[in-house]
């Protein structure tokens, strides 16, 4: 009897309940059939090195993410929950994933200092021996702090990312995803996606707040159709932002302000408040529960605490439900009569 060879894909299917729970904790849902189809077919056909049996390599996951988060019609917003869950399993692996993690890359060796040349034996000469001096080297970074150049060895961005320098060519388009790998991708391909991550892990594993920049909001608005024209496309965009960026309550209001009209925002908020669950899990009509779960004024939720993050997770889920509810417009009977 031959033994069955375990693969990353087969492992996830054997532990499917844990995979679904991991996705649910991130505010998304995944389905087993689509999970298999993406891994065995669609991601393989992207020609970025994704193996048919799946992988927990962050390099492969990052390559697939670049395709999924591509701007405009080239992206795949419906695949965001799946690749996000793959990344979560790779970066915070449960015990059954650890044996299948690729070995860590060896650190790049530091260049060895040049060994000093042996001094020549003393010989008599008619001329004095002068020491050889090298010409002074220019500094790697300009001394002017206002210079647009940055130190490419710096791994962490400044606390409030400001405007970026002019790009070599082509329009700037938005990007998404986790810090270290995304920083490297952005340096290699600066016109790909936005780097804003309102909530990210800081020192001592504490969440650190990074707001959206004006350029992020501008790019999302200018590269996507308005809600009135294509509500599904804009809803998919906002869903990918909610999943990957995990914005705070203030960030959500800023996002709605930038991407929706005043009437559209009112409709979205109204639909979202209709979906607030009660104690039995069904939509409630109790005003105090609705105001506490989906407030219209800024709540006192601390994203650095588990309770605050849970409030924000539910708020983002309800906001997405409100977008989908607002996208379902009632039939205009007057227009139907005109067509008939």
Swiss-Prot record:
Sorted alphabetically, the Gene Ontology cellular component annotations on this record are: host cell plasma membrane; membrane; viral capsid
Task: List residues with covalent lipid attachment of type N-myristoyl glycine.
Answer: 2
Stretches the record annotates as Disordered: 97-208
Bias class Low complexity marks the residues at 120-132
What are the BP-aspect GO terms? viral budding via host ESCRT complex
Where is the motif named LYPX(n)L motif mapped on this chain? 126-130
Which interval of the chain is the signal sequence?
none
Can you name one GO molecular function term for this protein? Answer: RNA binding
Q: Where is this motif: PPXY motif?
A: 157-160
In which residues does the motif PTAP/PSAP motif occur?
Answer: 118-121
Q: Which regions span the lipid bilayer? A: none
Q: Where is the composition biased (Pro residues)?
A: 100-119, 136-146
Q: List keywords of the entry alphabetically.
A: Capsid protein, Host cell membrane, Host membrane, Host-virus interaction, Lipoprotein, Membrane, Myristate, RNA-binding, Viral budding, Viral budding via the host ESCRT complexes, Viral matrix protein, Viral release from host cell, Virion
At what residues does the UniProt record annotate the site feature described as Cleavage?
Answer: 127-128, 197-198
UniProt-listed InterPro entries: G_retro_matrix, G_retro_matrix_sf, Gag_p12, Gag_P30, Retrov_capsid_N, Retroviral_Gag-Pol_poly, Retrovr_matrix
| Remaining remarks | This protein is synthesized as a Gag-Kit-Pol polyprotein.
Name listed for the protein in its UniProt record: Gag polyprotein
In its UniProt entry, the species of origin is given as Feline sarcoma virus (strain Hardy-Zuckerman 4)
Upper taxonomic classification of the species? Answer: Viruses, Riboviria, Pararnavirae, Artverviricota, Revtraviricetes
């Amino acid at each position: 009897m031959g033994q069955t060879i375990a693969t990353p894909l087969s492992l996830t299917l054997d532990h499917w309940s844990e995979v679904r729970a991991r996705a649910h904790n991130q505010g998304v849902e995944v389905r087993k059939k689509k999970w298999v189809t993406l891994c065995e077919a669609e991601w393989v056909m992207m020609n970025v090195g994704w193996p048919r049996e799946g992988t927990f390599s962050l390099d492969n996951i990052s390559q697939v993410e670049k395709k999924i988060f591509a701007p405009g019609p080239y992206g795949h917003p419906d695949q965001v929950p799946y690749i996000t869950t793959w990344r979560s399993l790779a970066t915070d692996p449960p015990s059954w994933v650890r044996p299948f993690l690729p070995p860590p890359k060896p650190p790049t060796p530091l260049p060895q200092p040049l060994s000093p040349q042996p001094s020549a034996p003393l010989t008599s000469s008619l001329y004095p021996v002068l020491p050889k001096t090298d010409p002074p080297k220019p500094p790697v970074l300009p001394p002017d702090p206002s210079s647009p150049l940055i130190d490419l060895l710096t791994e962490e961005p400044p606390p409030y990312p400001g405007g970026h320098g002019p790009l070599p060519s082509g329009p700037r388009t938005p990007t998404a995803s986790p810090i270290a790998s995304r920083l490297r991708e952005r340096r290699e391909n600066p016109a790909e996606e936005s780097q804003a991550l309102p909530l990210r892990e800081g020192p001592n594993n504490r969440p650190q707040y990074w707001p959206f920049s004006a350029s992020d909001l501008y790019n999302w608005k200018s590269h996507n159709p308005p809600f009135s024209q294509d509500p599904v496309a804009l809803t998919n965009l906002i869903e990918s932002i909610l999943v990957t960026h995990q914005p705070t309550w203030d960030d959500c209001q800023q996002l709605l302000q930038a991407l929706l009209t005043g009437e559209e925002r009112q409709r979205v908020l109204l639909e979202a408040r209709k979906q607030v669950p009660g104690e039995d899990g069904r939509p409630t009509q109790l005003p105090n529960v609705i105001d506490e779960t989906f407030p219209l004024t800024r709540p006192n939720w601390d994203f650095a605490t588990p309770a605050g993050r849970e409030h924000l997770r539910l708020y983002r889920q309800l906001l997405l439900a409100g977008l989908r509810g607002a996208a379902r417009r009632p039939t205009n009977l007057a227009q139907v009569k005109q067509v008939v």
